[in-house]
Amino acid sequence: MICSPQNNTGVIMKKRNFSAEFKRESAQLVVDQNYTVADAASAMDVGLSTMTRWVKQLRDERQGKTPKASPITPEQIEIRELRKKLQRIEMENEILKKATVDSIGQRNSYVKTWGCGGFLNETNIYSRGKSLCF
């Protein structure tokens, strides 16, 4: 745990980490069950500003806004994971595209090789764009 500055009593307080589920349930007290922010913060033993931030984030996420912080609603968590997966796949795709470019910057094209009815072999791949069709 990361230690934060001392509180009024001189005791060093540790930074608490809360799960997305805890944050969501705490904010739902205000949004869904009509607690005041102060009452919900007191009931869940968190700071007033923390509870205010969670409530705002829950409302924003329910309106479809992408959170800047870690998402707390299941839908936004899934969206974040899908975006990460898409980004990873796009990066892998870019790597594969770059791998098909040979040392002189020419693409080794499967379409060109098969376009003249030839077979994909080493001669066709390294022909450097020369037509091997007879």
UniProtKB/Swiss-Prot annotation:
InterPro entries: Homeodomain-like_sf, RD_transcriptional_regulator, Transposase_8. Pfam families: HTH_Tnp_1. One of its GO terms (biological process) is DNA transposition. Coiled coil: none annotated. Keywords: DNA recombination, DNA-binding, Transposable element, Transposition. GO terms for molecular function: DNA binding; transposase activity. SUPFAM superfamilies: Homeodomain-like. It comes from the Bacteria. Belongs to the transposase 8 family. Involved in the transposition of the insertion sequence IS911. PANTHER family: PROTEIN DISTAL ANTENNA, TRANSPOSASE INSN FOR INSERTION SEQUENCE ELEMENT IS911A-RELATED. This is Putative transposase InsN for insertion sequence element IS911A. The gene is insN1.
